[in-house]
């Protein structure tokens, strides 16, 4: 038997927090996982598999919601220059997955929106910012739209999902799908503990929460997402070289 101590780490400055706390195991989004693969030798033990998900490697997505009366907003490209509302800057499906959709359409996600209002999981929340007109559009994470409807926090017909994917999945989405939550070991974890945790997780029954832990793939897509956003393993792409500066300002330099 092993004694387990649980420590909650803030997503902001995750790498520094991990180095400070020195955990052997982490549970996080796929985005944080691929970041720590390259930085600290993270190794997947298992990934969450939920009943409602298409598959463990295609389970997490985002929706863009607008007020139903905003007839000027019909497509994701109509959102350029508008005000966005989201949960946290580093929230995987509450922010990054949605911004990846912007990048996939050839836009710079850093400048696409004129302003972003973050709710930080407090009130006013994302739908409220959109409802009162403080934001033009909001990003919601996996199945959050359906949960808000079920609990009565938003009403049917009050909001509209932009470019909803036409599929038979349990939850609507506007974006690509990515792997679910990952349980992984860091390079410092003792081998016998990694073995014990692996056996425990992979043999754990679904239970009342209707999910289980399984081995999963699909992380190449997460690398592509993080590269398009210049985050995580690709944060170095944000370093501007002289050549980059000249190319991005060549019009001004010629005047």
Predicted segments, located by residue:
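Extracytoplasmic small-molecule ligand-binding "clamshell" domains
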Residues: 1-35
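A ligand-binding cleft/hinge motif common to bilobed small-molecule-binding domains
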Residues: 27-41, 98-104, 131-132, 136-165
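Hydrophobic residues within well-ordered alpha-helices
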Residues: 17-19, 79, 129-131
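A bilobed periplasmic-binding-protein/Venus flytrap-type ligand-binding module shared by bacterial periplasmic
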Residues: 59-71, 169-192
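An extracytoplasmic/periplasmic, membrane-proximal ligand-sensing/linker region
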Residues: 1, 174, 189-255
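Short beta-strand->loop
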Residues: 42-57, 112-115, 149-176
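Bilobed "Venus flytrap"/periplasmic-binding protein-like clamshell domains
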Residues: 1, 54-128, 143
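Second-shell loop/turn segments in exported
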Residues: 83-91, 116-117, 134-135, 184-186, ...
């Amino acid at each position: 038997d092993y004694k387990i101590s649980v420590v909650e780490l803030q997503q902001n400055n995750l790498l520094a927090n991990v180095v400070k706390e020195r955990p052997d195991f982490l549970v996080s989004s796929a985005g944080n996982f691929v970041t720590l693969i390259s930085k600290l030798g993270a190794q997947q033990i298992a990934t969450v598999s939920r009943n409602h998900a298409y598959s463990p490697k295609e389970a997490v997505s985002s929706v863009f919601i607008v007020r139903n009366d905003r007839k000027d907003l019909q497509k994701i490209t109509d959102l350029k220059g508008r005000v966005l509302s989201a949960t946290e800057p580093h929230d995987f499906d509450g922010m990054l997955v949605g911004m990846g959709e912007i990048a996939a359409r050839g836009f710079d996600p850093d400048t696409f929106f004129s302003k972003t209002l973050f709710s930080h999981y407090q009130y006013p929340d994302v739908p409220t910012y959109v409802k009162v007109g403080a934001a033009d559009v909001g990003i919601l994470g996996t199945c959050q739209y359906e949960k808000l409807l079920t609990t009565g926090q938003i009403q049917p017909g009050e909001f509209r999902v932009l470019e909803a994917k036409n599929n038979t999945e349990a939850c609507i989405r506007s974006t690509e799908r990515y792997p679910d939550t990952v349980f992984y070991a860091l390079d410092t974890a003792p081998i016998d503990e990694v073995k014990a945790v692996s056996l425990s997780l992979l043999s754990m029954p679904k239970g009342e929460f209707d999910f289980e832990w399984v081995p999963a793939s699909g992380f190449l897509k997460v690398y592509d997402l993080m590269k398009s956003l210049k985050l995580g393993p690709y944060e170095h792409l944000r370093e501007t070289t002289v050549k980059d500066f000249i190319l991005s300002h060549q019009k001004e330099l010629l005047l």
